């Protein structure tokens, strides 16, 4: 039997299970693999295989995450599931597992709980754009009215965090019953609910825009001059594409962006007509002096990104065990903020009524940088002191 090769004919979407501890996220994840495996769309993953997620390090932060993949008739999915609440917080803030949408698991027997609320809030903050709900353990609820009550409660909760609660698909079922049955038939009382959930995920969570289709951006990693030809900026194209003769802007470290034209693109010492997201390139820039561009700036499609100094962010502060601070920090804390390729000093303003932030906390803060940097909502950064990472964050809004 020849090994099946991975055919990327279907659109790819990243999703994950979120919700309160013990509401059945991991059981549901296992059930999805079992049900989809009956039509050849997945390899069966047992509960304990998912639950014993390996440790990963993302920006110096230890996160336990299980990665499962499966496909429906229309799409290929990469699905993340985390064993502990802290792992979700870290995952969502560092963007270690970028989610195009999430399956919110709520126990029908208990209704929404504190972490249900916190995961919805985090999804709103870090830009998880779509949520589909699975009311799990509904085999334990005999009263139809109780199910309707939980359904209403979840919709109200989603509305309160600016998700369209009234239009959100909610499927009631039981991950455990589907897992125990495993027949995978659509007409089955329990396996059918898993199919219904996946049909809703297929229909409700849109296919994300691919990185190459977004406006061009390349963080500048290094700069050198070629005698007789001009200045070359090197880096990895983060998104979009760039062609020879395209106009671009140099953004960051100065008050205003500066326009220039890309007169050459090279990769592995070969000249190219264009480069796209993922390529490591050197871009030859017209009329730019070696001293007028530096690491920490970005090359971008004109008008697509601006330099800013003031923004709001959701941050996670590393614990002592993770190599972070041993002590809390206070209002006016001045660490370095590492964006893409460079460190910039900034001042932290804590929310009203918050005196201090302890290692292990996650919190919303305002930051004022001393130098403008090309930033936008959704951009991830590290917080450092003397080159050592003490926190991670994501930009949730630009203040000016």
From Swiss-Prot:
Keyword Ribonucleoprotein attributed: no
**Which reactions are catalysed by this chain?**
GTP + H2O = GDP + phosphate + H(+)
Task: Report the subcellular localization.
Answer: Cytoplasm
Keyword Magnesium among UniProt keywords: yes
Query: What are its E.C. numbers?
Result: 3.6.5.3
User: Which CDD domains does this entry report, sorted A to Z?
Assistant: EF_Tu, EFTU_II, EFTU_III
Which residues does UniProt assign to the signal peptide? none
Q: Looking at the record, which segments are called G3?
A: 81-84
Q: What class of enzyme is it?
A: hydrolase
State where GTP binds. Answer: 19-26, 81-85, 136-139
UniProt-annotated stretches for the region G2: 60-64
Q: List the disulfide bonds.
A: none
Chain positions covered by the region annotation G5: 174-176
The Gene Ontology terms for molecular function here are: GTP binding; GTPase activity; translation elongation factor activity
Per UniProt, the keywords (alphabetical) are:
Cytoplasm, Elongation factor, GTP-binding, Hydrolase, Magnesium, Metal-binding, Nucleotide-binding, Protein biosynthesis
Annotated region G1: the residues are 19-26
- InterPro entries, A to Z: EF-Tu_GTP-bd (IPR041709), EF-Tu_GTPase (IPR050055), EFTu-like_2 (IPR004161), EFTU_2 (IPR033720), G_TR_CS (IPR031157), P-loop_NTPase (IPR027417), Small_GTP-bd (IPR005225), T_Tr_GTP-bd_dom (IPR000795)
Residues the record lists as binding Mg(2+) = 26
Question: Where are the annotated segments for G4?
Answer: 136-139
Name a single GO cellular component.
cytosol
Provide the tr-type G domain boundaries. Answer: 10-209
Quaternary structure and interacting proteins, as annotated: Monomer.
UniProt lists the family membership as follows: Belongs to the TRAFAC class translation factor GTPase superfamily. Classic translation factor GTPase family. EF-Tu/EF-1A subfamily.
State what this protein does: GTP hydrolase that promotes the GTP-dependent binding of aminoacyl-tRNA to the A-site of ribosomes during protein biosynthesis.
Q: What is this protein called?
A: Elongation factor Tu
Native source species: Desulforamulus reducens (strain ATCC BAA-1160 / DSM 100696 / MI-1)
Gene giving rise to this polypeptide: tuf
């Amino acid at each position: 039997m020849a090994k099946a090769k991975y055919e990327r004919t279907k659109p790819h979407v990243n999703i994950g299970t979120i919700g309160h501890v013990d509401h059945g996220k991991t059981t549901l994840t296992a059930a999805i693999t079992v049900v989809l495996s009956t039509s050849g769309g997945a390899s069966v993953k047992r509960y304990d295989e998912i639950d014993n997620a390996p440790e990963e390090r993302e920006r110096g932060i230890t996160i336990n995450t299980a990665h499962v993949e499966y496909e429906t008739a229309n799409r290929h999915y990469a699905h993340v599931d985390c064993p502990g609440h802290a792992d979700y917080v870290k995952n969502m803030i560092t963007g270690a597992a970028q989610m195009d949408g999430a399956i919110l698991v709520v126990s029908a027997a208990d209704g929404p709980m504190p972490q249900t609320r916190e995961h919805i809030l985090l999804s709103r903050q870090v830009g998880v754009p779509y949520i589909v709900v699975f009311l799990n353990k509904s085999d334990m609820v005999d009263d139809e009215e109780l199910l309707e009550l939980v359904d209403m409660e979840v919709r109200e909760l989603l509305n309160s965090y600016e998700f369209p609660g009234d239009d959100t698909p909610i499927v009631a079922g039981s991950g455990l019953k589907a897992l125990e049955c495993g027949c995978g038939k659509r007409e089955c009382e329990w396996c059918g609910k898993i199919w219904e959930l996946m049909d809703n995920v297929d229909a409700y969570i849109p296919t994300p825009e691919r990185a190459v289709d977004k406006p061009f951006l390349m963080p500048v990693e290094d700069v050198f001059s070629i005698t007789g030809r001009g200045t070359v900026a090197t880096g990895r194209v983060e998104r979009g594409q760039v062609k020879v003769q395209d106009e671009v802007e140099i953004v960051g470290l100065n008050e205003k962006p500066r326009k220039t034209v890309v007169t050459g693109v090279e990769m592995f010492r070969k000249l190219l007509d264009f480069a796209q997201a993922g390529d490591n390139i050197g871009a030859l820039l017209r009329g730019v002096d070696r001293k007028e561009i530096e690491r920490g700036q970005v090359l971008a499609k004109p008008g697509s990104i601006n330099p800013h100094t003031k923004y709001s962010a959701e941050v996670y502060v590393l614990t002592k065990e993770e190599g972070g601070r041993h002590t809390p920090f206070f209002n006016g804390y001045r660490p370095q903020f590492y964006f893409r390729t460079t460190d910039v000093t900034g001042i932290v303003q804590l929310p009203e009524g918050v005196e201090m932030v302890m290692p292990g906390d996650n919190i919303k803060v305002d930051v004022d940088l001393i130098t403008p940097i090309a930033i936008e909502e959704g951009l991830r950064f590290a917080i450092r002191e003397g080159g050592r990472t003490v926190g991670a964050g994501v930009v949730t809004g630009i203040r000016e």
